[in-house]
Curated annotation (Swiss-Prot):
Taxonomic lineage from the root: Bacteria, Pseudomonadati, Pseudomonadota, Betaproteobacteria, Rhodocyclales
Assembly information from the UniProt record: Homotetramer.
Binding site for Zn(2+): 60, 64, 174, 182
Alphabetized Pfam families for the sequence: SIS_2
Protein name: Phosphoheptose isomerase
Domain SIS: 36-196
Gene behind the chain: gmhA
C-alpha cells in the first residue's frame, strides 16, 4: 500500500468536492450570511446542533461567534445545544434521544432566532425534531446537510435555507461543512465590520 499516494488522493478528493460545491452553494451561503447577520443585529441568537462530528461543528461555529473568527469584534449570540451533558442525558433518559435538541429549542428559542441544524445525512431524528420545534417558534432554519438533503431537505420551509453539499461520502461532506462554517463566520464579520 502506498500511503503517500493514499494521503494525496484524500487531499485531491477533498479539494474537488469543495470545487464541485461552490457553484451550487455560494448563493445560499450568501443568503445564510445575510439572514444570520440580520438576526444578530436585531438582538436574536443562533442555536446550533448536530451529532458526532456535526456536534463538533456546531460548537466550533458558536465558539467563532462568541469569541472571534479572524478579526476582533463584539461578541455575537450563539449557543451550541450539544455541550451540556446534564441537559442532554436528562432529556435522553427521561424522554428520548430524539428530543435532546428540540426541548432546548423550545426553551431557548424565540421568534426571529435561527437554528443552524447540521446533519451529514439529512436524516438525523433529533435534528428533524429540533427543526419542527424551531418552526413552532417561528424561527428561521439554516440546514447544513449532504447526501441529497434527506428528510430535512423535504421539510424545510420557503423562509429556511438549505446548504446541501453535493456529495455522498461522509468525510468529504464533513470537510466541506467546516469550510461552509468558516464562510458563514467570515461573511458575518465582513458585513458587521464593513470589510471588503
Amino acid at each position: 500500500m502506498d500511503l503517500i499516494a493514499r494521503v494525496a488522493k484524500n487531499f485531491e478528493d477533498s479539494a474537488q468536492t469543495k470545487l464541485n460545491a461552490v457553484d451550487m452553494m455560494a448563493a445560499p451561503i450568501a443568503a445564510a450570511i445575510e439572514t444570520m447577520t440580520n438576526c444578530l443585529i436585531n438582538g436574536g441568537k443562533i442555536l446550533a446542533c448536530g451529532n458526532g462530528g456535526s456536534a463538533g461543528d456546531s460548537q466550533h461555529f458558536a465558539a467563532e461567534l462568541i469569541g472571534r473568527f479572524e478579526a476582533e469584534r463584539q461578541e455575537l449570540a450563539a449557543i451550541a445545544l450539544t455541550t451540556d451533558s446534564s441537559i442532554l442525558t436528562a432529556i435522553g433518559n427521561d424522554y428520548s434521544f430524539n428530543q435532546i435538541f428540540s426541548k432546548q429549542v423550545r426553551g431557548l428559542g424565540h421568534s426571529g432566532d435561527i437554528l443552524l441544524a447540521i446533519s451529514t445525512s439529512g436524516n438525523s431524528g433529533n435534528i428533524i425534531e429540533a427543526i419542527k420545534a424551531a418552526h413552532e417558534h417561528d424561527m428561521h432554519v439554516i440546514a447544513l446537510t449532504g447526501k441529497g438533503g434527506g428528510q430535512i431537505g423535504e421539510m424545510l420551509r420557503d423562509a429556511d435555507i438549505h446548504l446541501c453539499v453535493p456529495a455522498d461520502r461522509t468525510a468529504r461532506i464533513q470537510e466541506t461543512h467546516l469550510l461552509v462554517i468558516h464562510c458563514l463566520c467570515d461573511g458575518i464579520d465582513a458585513l458587521l465590520l464593513g470589510v471588503e
